[in-house]
C-alpha cells in the first residue's frame, strides 16, 4: 500500500484522480513517464492512499471496488482505495497553470489549447487535466459545469509541451479531447460533466 499526500485541490475534486495516476507511475518508475498508457477512473478517489492489484488475479468484487484501472507497457493493475479519508484541501494551482495555456479558435467546432511547458513540480497528468478543463470552460461549454476526469490514453507521457483539441460531446455529459504533440495525435482525454 502507498500512503500518498493526496489532498483535494480547490472547490472541486476532479483533479485528484490525476494525482493518483502520477503517484502510481512514480512508484513504478521513479517518474511519471511511461508508454502505451490507458488509465480509466471508475469512481472518485476519497482516500489518502491506494494499493495495487494485478488485474489477472483480481476477483469480480475487487474489479467492482477498484477506483481506477491502469495499463501500460509493463503493468495491468487495479488501483484500490486504502487508508484514511482525504480531509485536507488546498488552493488549486490552476490559475498559475493557465499562464502557460494559449487557445486556438480558428476552428470553432474543435478549438485547441496549447501547453507551452509543465509547471515546476506539477506532473503531466495534473497539467493535462487542468488544460482540458480550461479548454472546455473557455471555448466549448457555455454554462457552469462540474467535471470529473474519466480516462487518459497516451502513447507516451514523456511530454513537456503539447496541445489538446476538443473532439466531441457524448450525450451532453461526456467530453472527448485529442492530445497532440507537434500537431500529431498522441492520445485522448475524457471527462464526465454535469451542469453545476
Language-model features: where?
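Hydrophobic beta-strand-centered segment that forms part of the acyl-chain substrate-binding groove
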Residues: 25-61, 66-68, 129-168, 172, ...
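Catalytic strand-loop segment that frames the active site of acyl-thioester-processing enzymes
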Residues: 1-14, 83-125, 135
Amino acid at each position: 500500500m502507498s500512503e500518498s499526500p493526496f489532498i483535494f485541490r480547490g472547490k472541486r475534486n476532479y483533479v485528484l484522480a490525476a494525482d493518483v495516476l502520477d503517484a502510481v507511475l512514480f512508484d513504478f518508475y521513479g517518474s511519471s513517464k511511461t508508454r502505451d498508457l490507458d488509465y480509466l477512473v471508475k469512481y472518485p478517489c476519497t482516500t489518502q492512499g491506494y494499493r495495487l492489484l494485478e488485474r489477472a488475479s483480481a476477483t469480480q468484487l475487487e474489479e467492482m471496488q477498484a477506483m481506477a484501472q491502469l495499463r501500460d507497457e509493463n503493468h495491468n493493475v487495479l488501483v484500490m482505495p486504502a487508508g484514511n479519508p482525504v480531509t485536507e484541501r488546498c488552493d488549486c494551482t490552476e490559475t498559475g497553470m493557465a499562464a502557460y495555456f494559449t487557445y486556438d479558435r480558428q476552428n470553432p467546432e474543435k478549438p485547441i489549447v496549447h501547453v507551452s511547458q509543465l509547471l515546476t513540480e506539477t506532473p503531466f497528468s495534473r497539467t493535462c487535466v487542468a488544460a482540458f478543463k480550461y479548454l472546455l470552460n473557455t471555448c466549448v461549454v457555455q454554462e457552469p459545469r462540474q467535471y470529473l476526469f474519466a480516462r487518459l490514453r497516451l502513447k507516451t507521457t514523456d511530454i513537456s509541451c503539447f496541445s489538446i483539441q476538443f473532439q466531441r460531446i457524448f450525450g451532453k455529459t461526456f467530453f472527448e479531447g485529442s492530445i497532440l504533440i507537434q500537431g500529431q495525435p498522441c492520445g485522448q482525454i475524457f471527462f464526465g460533466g454535469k451542469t453545476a
